[in-house]
Amino acid sequence: MSHSACPKPATARHSQALTGEIRIPGDKSISHRSFMFGGLASGKTRITGLLEGEDVINTGRAMQAMGARIRKEGDVWIINGVGNGCLLQPEAPLDFGNAGTGARLTMGLVGTYDMKTSFIGDASLSKRPMGRVLNPLREMGVQVEAAEGDRMPLTLIGPRTANPIAYRVPMASAQVKSAVLLAGLNTPGVTTVIEPVMTRDHTEKMLQGFGADLTVETDKDGVRHIRIVGQGKLTGQTIDVPGDPSSTAFPLVAALLVEGSDVTIRNVLMNPTRTGLILTLQEMGADIEIIDPRLAGGEDVADLRVRASKLKGVVVPPERAPSMIDEYPVLAIAASFAEGETVMDGLDELRVKESDRLAAVARGLEANGVDCTEGEMSLTVRGRPGGKGLGGGTVATHLDHRIAMSFLVMGLASEKPVTVDDSTMIATSFPEFMGMMAGLGAKIAESGAE
């Protein structure tokens, strides 16, 4: 799916107070896994609150291509799964569009099957490195035919019987951890993942919920040992997907920056591996009230009331990066309006996202008058309270939905408008973004729609 074929620029202008109550679309990580585990489990899985962005739908299509039956009735997705170990060889390559999570997790899921599976994606996904997932699969006996640098398009040829491995994850990556655990589902014996730095743990929680024999132990040094016994039975479940914290970040930061704003965001996932942004903003002085914290489907959920706040710069501890890796672009926007300097470090993962996200953010900030310094793995932003003199630039989004949404948020509070060169790809993660922001009072218009 090529987004660049017909780009839709959009411009955000200085807005009056944002007010109202919103419910954020379902969490992307949990939505991908709901389709995957539901498609793999025996019996019926029912999902409400699913994020219906293109990325997640592509994961659903991949599961259908391997035998799962998926349909929608009203607001509920109903999946009849094939049963663990019973995926079918797809007749055509699996097309993941822009979905890095869907592609990498599915590589783990199918790699250990005695079959041939091909993966393709859009221009952006085809540039992203897949070796980090392919290397442990190779250790399990999977043969890989890939484009140069272990990139897509690629084909996996599974072994007759996979070898269980103990794999130490070399970087903080939930996708690598998850791919190995999913490969372990169809592997005899015990597959172990050793995780020195904890990352989002939806795969572990959800697999346990579906009945997998999976245990997690944390040693005295904080290193997690996750063990899964292969070839067990998974059983269909009922899932209500909580709101995505990474999508929540955009209206949340907008409400903090636009003077006089008071916005309530309902049903937000508050899993501790995902709340780094909220913690950081609170340290900067953000007025974020956490209302009715509760458990839903084994996950922490709460409502957030966010009021406009005067922010001050902070140093963000690098070890917090895994819990907010997708939120750094919008944190950089918040930092642009804060008093003093904000230092973000440990950002090497941002270099291999949908774009080189670190460079894209730095260029976008510079184009809009922000004083910032880009390091190899760091970004330092010196803010201008009230957004005085900020804006007036056009941002190259590089087909990256989070860059587009972050800079549209900037334009709502900066003195001059901010334009992004394309907004079509926002649909990959947050199709309702434009309408939801407009409902709160944000002035965002697609070019030509003035």
Curated annotation (Swiss-Prot):
Monomer. GO terms for cellular component: cytoplasm. This is 3-phosphoshikimate 1-carboxyvinyltransferase. The active site is at D326. Catalyzes the transfer of the enolpyruvyl moiety of phosphoenolpyruvate (PEP) to the 5-hydroxyl of shikimate-3-phosphate (S3P) to produce enolpyruvyl shikimate-3-phosphate and inorganic phosphate. Pathway: Metabolic intermediate biosynthesis; chorismate biosynthesis; chorismate from D-erythrose 4-phosphate and phosphoenolpyruvate: step 6/7. Belongs to the EPSP synthase family. Its EC number is 2.5.1.19. 3-phosphoshikimate binds at K28, S29, R33, S173, Q175, D326, K353. The gene is aroA. Its main location: cytoplasm. The lineage of its organism: Bacteria, Pseudomonadati, Pseudomonadota, Alphaproteobacteria, Hyphomicrobiales.
